[in-house]
Structures are given as C-alpha cells and as structure tokens.
Amino acid sequence: MPEKEVFSFREAQEFLEMLDNLSDDTINQRICIKLMLLTGIRNGELHGLRWSDVDLKNRILHVRRNRLVSREFGIYEKCPKTKTSLRDIPMPDNLVDDLKKYKEWFRLADEHFDEKQDEYYLAVGLDRQPLYPHTIAHILTKLEAKYGFKHVSCHGLRHTYCSLLISQNVPIQTVSKYMGHSDSTVTLEVYSHFIPDTQEKVVFALNNISKK
C-alpha cells in the first residue's frame, strides 16, 4: 500500500502554530482543521459532530455519525459502517481550550444555545449553519498554499494523527482504537513504516538472553 502524504512531527507543530495565530474571525475553520489533526477523525465524522458529542469536562469527543454528500442522495447522515467507528477519543488541552472559545462564539448568536446543543453542528459557517461536506478540504488547501505548507489532505491529517501517535510509542492497539479501525492489523498494514526502529532494543534483549 502506498505511503500517504503526512506532516512530520515538526511540520505538525508549525502547522498548529499557524492555525493558532489565525484571527478568531475564522475560529470555525481553525476548529474544524484542528479536530481532524488532533483526534484523527474522518471528514464525514467531522461534519457529523454536534455539540452534544463534545464532553469538555472529561476532554472526550464522541464519534457517533457521518455527514456525507453524494449525487444520488445529496447531503445525508448515516451511522459509521463498523461498530469500532463508534468511539470516544481523548482531546489534548490545546484543542479543549479552543473548543471552549468556540462554544462562546455559538452563544453570541443564540442565547439559548446551551439548551439546543444537539441541534448545532461543529462544522459550520459564520452563520452557524452546517458547512457543505467538501468545504473544509478547500479551506485546508488554501491555508497550506498561503502559508507555505506542503499539501496534506483532510484524510492526510488523519494519517498524520496516526503516524504521530505511533512515532511517539503509543501502543498500536490504542492507536487502532482511536482511529476506529476494525483491528490493529489494519493499523499495522498501513502505518508500520512509522514505527520507530527498535533494532538496538532487540539486540540488547537478545544479548541479555544469551549471556552465560
């Protein structure tokens, strides 16, 4: 299977720094892109997220549905195709802090927002209405070009999330769980080249075993 275009650890840091320096006038764009990079969710899962799926207190994102588009059906929602795609993903502090600001942005437009969180999607335009499912991909491409980053697609952000976790020695079973893969074999097949070289550890272990 061919390798995917991803950000390296350093590139991801620089990309996040760029996002964090964007004006709060585009907080909706920043949040959507950071959600894909920092939780590994698919584009359809991003557009299916509602505020009732966000647990800021426990720093958990609940992935429960996809919001997709096709010529035959137009824009529609569906449950993930596998049970493992229904998952809870931990969120880092930086993302949680941004989501708190984002929630205030919604409250500015609707004083009854807290009572209607199941009605509001996270991937929205400035009017707080749901974005067309392909919009974030176009925004991402424009930002990368404007600020001199290589092109990494929405799915590439998901691959980046996975590769960064693996390179930081997060257990493959844990990575597979948060990616929503059916089992860790799928994760290994696609991302094995990101696993850190453990040759020295293997030699050290074998030397200990073979000592007399």
Question: Where are each of the predicted segments found?
Answer:
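Basic, Lys/Arg- and aromatic-enriched nucleic-acid-binding interface segment
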Residues: 1-49, 57, 86, 94, ...
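Short, basic (Lys/Arg/His-rich) helix/loop patches that form interaction surfaces
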Residues: 17-29, 39, 89, 105-121, ...
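The DNA-recognition helices of helix-turn-helix-type DNA-binding domains
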Residues: 53, 106, 160, 182, ...
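Proline-centered turn/helix-capping motifs that create local helix->coil transitions or kinks
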Residues: 56, 62-65, 69, 101-113
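C-terminal secondary-structure termini that scaffold catalytic or DNA-interacting sites
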Residues: 58, 71, 76-86, 93-95, ...
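Short functional hotspots where side chains directly engage DNA or cofactors
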Residues: 58-63, 153, 164, 176-194, ...
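Generic beta-structure capping elements
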Residues: 64-66, 94, 126, 157
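DNA/chromatin major-groove-contacting recognition/catalytic segments
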Residues: 72-77, 168, 189, 193-212
